[in-house]
């Protein structure tokens, strides 16, 4: 039996996520130096609304979107009922902040973040995560992104990152391409402090195995609130150092073309596999905000193959597959030998 959340749970999570949106937008405007976010507030007929912020054509970001929403309704979509049937028949509430950044320079990765909270009758949970999608990756950048999120998880519980890292690799996977969307990060969902940490569908996967190894969760509502808070605060220190290192790096039309080609994979994942996109469309969300994650430009090329030994080939052979980014000495050696460590 789940413990009831605090009486002010909805207001508390709403304020957390609004503050997260504000802090991220401020940090991104500062590092961009040129672009400014424009804001649109919107209301949903069935209840709730949000504020969508988009920065276009900055010095760093071709497009950056940071959205907040707070919505409620009476009829749950099937995607939720299939996961938590005990929520059926109850009015529901959901709030979240989501972000996708599409930089101009191919040496600066695309990045995504989402933290959310849901209630329906006796059911409540937290979900969220952040993941990085580089086009011309460097191992040091990958490590910094992972390390900041690992530290954030471990402030709450030493075992969480052991599950959230492989869960991210599992979730952001394009089954029809047999490749990861990027180098991962953290991902978690349906966290209510009861049972196993892993709540995904792949019972034989690495995340499920890690969850079984660490045992059952014993976190309460406040712990999980702190998890969302810590992980949200980890984003800027995980990403801004990459911008500072790569923003001045020169690139050619060839590298821009490859960036646009790989952005096509981002589009494919978000429209075919992403649960957040599906939930938003099923619940009559604001379409412009839901599809804010899509890049302003992308391209597809039939039968593309990267040249062996090229930076483009390194991406698809190494950096779109789950890795032990910190402890694999062969990977570290390879990256150093091929000038893709730092």
Curated annotation (Swiss-Prot):
Enzyme Commission number(s): 1.3.3.3
Catalytic-site annotation from UniProt: 112 (proton donor)
Alphabetical UniProt keywords: Chlorophyll biosynthesis, Cytoplasm, Heme biosynthesis, Metal-binding, Oxidoreductase, Porphyrin biosynthesis
Binding site for a divalent metal cation: 102, 112, 146, 176
Main location: cytoplasm
Signal sequence bounds: none
Region of interest (Important for dimerization), ranges: 266-301
GO molecular function terms listed in the Swiss-Prot or TrEMBL record: coproporphyrinogen oxidase activity; metal ion binding; protein homodimerization activity
GO biological process: chlorophyll biosynthetic process; protoporphyrinogen IX biosynthetic process
Transmembrane segments: none
Cofactors required: a divalent metal cation
Site residues (Important for dimerization), renumbered to this chain: 176
Pfam families on file: Coprogen_oxidas
Function: Involved in the heme and chlorophyll biosynthesis. Catalyzes the aerobic oxidative decarboxylation of propionate groups of rings A and B of coproporphyrinogen-III to yield the vinyl groups in protoporphyrinogen-IX.
Assembly and interaction partners: Homodimer.
Family annotation (HAMAP family): Coprogen_oxidas (MF_00333)
Sequence similarity: Belongs to the aerobic coproporphyrinogen-III oxidase family.
Identification of the protein by name: Oxygen-dependent coproporphyrinogen-III oxidase
Origin species: Prochlorococcus marinus (strain AS9601)
The encoding gene: hemF
């Amino acid at each position: 039996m789940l413990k009831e959340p605090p009486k002010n749970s909805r207001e508390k999570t709403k304020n957390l996520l609004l503050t997260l949106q504000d802090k991220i937008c401020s940090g991104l405007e500062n590092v961009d130096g040129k672009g400014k976010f424009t804001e649109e507030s919107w209301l949903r007929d069935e209840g709730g609304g949000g504020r969508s912020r988009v920065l276009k054509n900055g010095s760093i970001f071709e497009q950056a979107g940071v959205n907040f929403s707070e919505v409620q309704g009476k009829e749950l979509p099937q995607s939720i009922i299939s996961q938590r049937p005990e929520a059926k028949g109850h009015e529901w509430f959901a709030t979240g902040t989501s972000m996708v950044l599409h930089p101009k320079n191919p040496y600066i990765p695309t990045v995504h973040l989402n933290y959310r909270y849901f209630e329906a009758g006796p059911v409540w949970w937290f979900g969220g995560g952040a993941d990085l999608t580089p086009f011309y990756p460097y191992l040091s950048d990958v490590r910094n992104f992972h390390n900041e999120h690992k530290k954030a998880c471990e402030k709450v519980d030493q075992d969480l990152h052991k599950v959230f890292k492989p869960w991210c690799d599992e979730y952001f996977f394009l089954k029809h391409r047999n490749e990861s969307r990027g180098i991962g990060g953290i991902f978690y969902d349906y966290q209510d402090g009861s049972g196993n940490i892993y709540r995904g569908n792949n019972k034989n996967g690495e995340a499920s195995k890690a969850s079984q190894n660490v045992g059952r969760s014993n976190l309460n509502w406040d712990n999980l609130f702190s998890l969302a808070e810590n992980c949200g605060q980890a984003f800027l220190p995980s990403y801004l150092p990459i911008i500072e290192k790569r923003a001045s790096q020169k690139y050619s039309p060839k590298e821009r073309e490859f960036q646009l080609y790989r952005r096509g994979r981002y589009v494919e994942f978000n429209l075919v596999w992403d649960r957040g996109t599906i939930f938003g469309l099923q619940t009559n969300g604001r379409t412009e905000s839901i599809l804010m994650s899509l890049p302003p430009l992308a391209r597809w090329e039939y039968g593309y193959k990267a040249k062996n030994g090229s930076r483009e080939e390194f991406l698809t052979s190494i950096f779109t597959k789950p890795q032990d980014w910190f402890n694999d000495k062969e990977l570290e050696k390879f990256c150093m030998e091929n000038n893709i460590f730092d």
